[in-house]
Amino acid sequence: MSFSDNLVKILDKYENLGKKLSSGIIGDEFVKASKEYAELEDVVVKIKQYNKAKSELEEANNFRLEMALDNATLEMIDNEIHTLENLLPKLERAVRISLLPKDEADSKSAIIEVRAGSGGEEAALFAAVLFNMYQRYSEFKGWRFEILAISDTGIGGYKEASASIKGKDVFSKLKFESGVHRVQRIPETESQGRIHTSAATVAVLPEAEGIDIKIEDKDLRIDTYRASGAGGQHVNTTDSAVRITHIPTGITVALQDEKSQHKNKAKALKILRARLYEEKRRQKEQERSDSRRGQVGSGDRSERIRTYNFPQGRVSDHRINLTLYKIDEVVKHGQLDEFIEALIANDEAKKLSEL
């Protein structure tokens, strides 16, 4: 089917769905049709913009050929033709991008996990910096950032930390943050002024709902124990800490942040559900491994994706060769959009080239 034929088919489907919704259907049929109609809305707007510009260009070219025009009118028509000829490829690209297969998880909220990697206490301090950076970015985007768990070192660093980030299309924006983030800076305790390199790992998981992942009680082993502080001492006299193991996969989540065992269990289940959903997605993607060759990075947590060099004031994303000399804006204020938009655009370009 040609590109033009495909556009006609989509417009026809959208029109028929509109008529169907107006006919008084109810129940599951109405819900299904409403969902399909809403999913087509964005691409239909882009198709109509493309068709309008294409029609206007054709009319302008015909007018130029068929009419006797004075110089002023001819110049005006030529300018209009030039503008439309530049606009049309951009509108066509926008249509093609909107027709790309959608990641079913893109519209979901996300769970982000940050873990200190190599580099000792400096790595833990960097993990805290990253976690706070994502919190600032979430506030900037108007998302709700809920801390799930923090394992701190007692002097400002985080061994690991996780949060739930709720909002529209959160996962689509943050999914490229998964991987190894490296920092180069001079630690406050470094008397010789030497630059140290350390790392932290970020994992971004789509937040799963009950309809995405069904967890049977028989598949869970739940252990409770007393919460301990940074030095290992017990900080609670009740068994409020919870460790949940999903027996079929061996995936384990332990949580002790809340004083309530019930709250710790609820948060642990949320993280477990997200990890199981991500594992399900990973297996599906492995089956379609050929389609992943063109993506920007693999999302592999072992892949080094970005370097934060404090002495030089730069942040470099190695997947798209983008360097910004604005480390304070990025790290302290969470201004990540320039990286995120470039990563999304590059991913779309790779996918378009594979069509």
From Swiss-Prot:
| Predominant location category | cytoplasm
Name the PROSITE patterns on file. RF_PROK_I
- Specify residue ranges for compositional bias: Basic and acidic residues: 280-293
In terms of SMART domains, this protein maps to: PCRF
Q: What residues bear N5-methylglutamine in this entry?
A: Q233
Q: Alphabetically list the UniProt keywords.
A: Cytoplasm, Methylation, Protein biosynthesis
Q: Which Pfam families match?
A: PCRF (PF03462), RF-1 (PF00472)
MF terms per GO, please? translation release factor activity, codon specific
Q: Which residues form the signal peptide?
A: none
Q: Where in the cell does this protein reside?
A: Cytoplasm
Q: How is it modified after translation?
A: Methylated by PrmC. Methylation increases the termination efficiency of RF1.
User: Per the record, GO CC terms?
Assistant: cytoplasm
Region span, Disordered = 280-310
Task: State the function annotated in the UniProt record.
Answer: Peptide chain release factor 1 directs the termination of translation in response to the peptide chain termination codons UAG and UAA.
Family to which this protein belongs: Belongs to the prokaryotic/mitochondrial release factor family.
Q: What is this protein called?
A: Peptide chain release factor 1
User: Which source organism does the UniProt entry give?
Assistant: Rickettsia prowazekii (strain Madrid E)
Per the record, the gene is: prfA
